[in-house]
Amino acid sequence: MAVITMIEAQKRSGRYNVYLDGAYAFPVSESVLVDFRLAKGMEVDKALTAQLIDADNVAKAYNRALDYLSQQLRTEKEVRDKLADLEIPAETIAATLQRLRSLALVDDAHYAASYVRTMMHTGDKGPRVIRQNLRHKGVLEQPIDEALTLYTTEEQLTVGTAVAAKLAKRYQRQPFGTQQQKIRQGLLTRGFDNDLATKMLATLDLTPDEDEQWALLVKQGEKLWHRYRTLSMRERQYKTKQALYRKGFNLDDISRWLADLGESAQ
């Protein structure tokens, strides 16, 4: 059985070299040194040596994890993936995560709640997208469900209505029907449900600017009328009317414009 003859501090803080029977044997971290009460004169067999090396590997992985966690909150999956990228063995990662959990340094339920609160106050996403993001980060359904209870209907309406107002401004030069469709689609894409999107649109109480809508219709209509110039008059009118309606213009306005066009052509 070998005997520890010297424990020497490395230049790196918190790291030590252990010598057995006068020869360098292996390095350990300060936490391993303390946990195993290593001291000069202590006997060390092969089993203990292997145990010390394993413990040191966990200690090094733990420190890598702490560095990663110091930047921001992380999920277990994010920490696991980071350590795996560093080519740390799976069993060492498992032991490291167990230690992190015991110290509440990784806690997916806490992460999910924090993420939801942050998205409520600084983001523009609804519950569905938030759920997808948390799933992608490896959080299980139960903690996601619990965290999303923080995002009440009232909070969703507040966030979503602000998003809808920005979208309304972005699409204000579109046909009114198209503007409405794009606002709704933007809300759905961001994870709000359809019923709430309807309420958000109602809260905005948008009304079309008749003069602006008419000018847009005339501009688009003239382009389409020219595009279908080779068709018969009946088919030309039908195609133009259909295309303008698909673009979101009011059907009565389209009919009026076509009637005016017909009169001017006579």
Swiss-Prot record:
GO terms for biological process: regulation of DNA repair. It is found in: Cytoplasm. InterPro entries: RecX_HTH_1st (IPR053926), RecX_HTH_2nd (IPR053924), RecX_HTH_3rd (IPR053925), Regulatory_RecX (IPR003783), WH-like_DNA-bd_sf (IPR036388). Pfam families: RecX_HTH1 (PF21982), RecX_HTH2 (PF02631), RecX_HTH3 (PF21981). The keyword Ribonucleoprotein does not apply. Its main location: cytoplasm. One of its GO terms (cellular component) is cytoplasm. PANTHER family: REGULATORY PROTEIN RECX FAMILY PROTEIN (PTHR33602:SF1). Belongs to the RecX family. This is Regulatory protein RecX.
